[in-house]
Amino acid sequence: MIFETLDTSGHEQVVFCSNPDAGLKAIIAIHSTVLGPALGGVRMRSYVDTQAALTDALRLSRTMTYKNALAGLNVGGGKAILIGDPATEKTEAAFRGFGRYVDSLGGRYITAEDMGTDVNDMENVYRETEYVVGVHQVHGGSGDPAPFTAYGALQGLMATLNRKFGNEE
């Protein structure tokens, strides 16, 4: 089933990452690099099986392609999934191992914080690769992206209200 899913997904590259000693099981999905390197966060959560994690990674990476293009960014779309419960299975070793996989892609994929991960996790990824955004400001990063995400969501709501009701206030 996994290969059938990959054959019809239209993705450029999918990487399965495994390091049992580090507790790492992950999937990196690169949907498109037409506009530039694939950019998208890494989320950590439990899945019923690998197929469910793959399906999520493919769906989310495709969405990132469109989201980044609509935002006018010179980046493509990608997404990564760390399979595991962030409350009980999150380790420095897993994120550093993931960082080595990201680094092996040579800049084709740039990762960032997403559901189940935080700035400290991105710091562990950063210890292994430069292809990560959202690290602490002392390392030249933007830090926690939550305020920017909230602002973007607010702007989207305001634009929707303006479109519906014609009032810019």
Regions found by a protein language model. Give the residues of each.
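N-terminal ligand-binding/catalytic initiation module
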Residues: 1-143
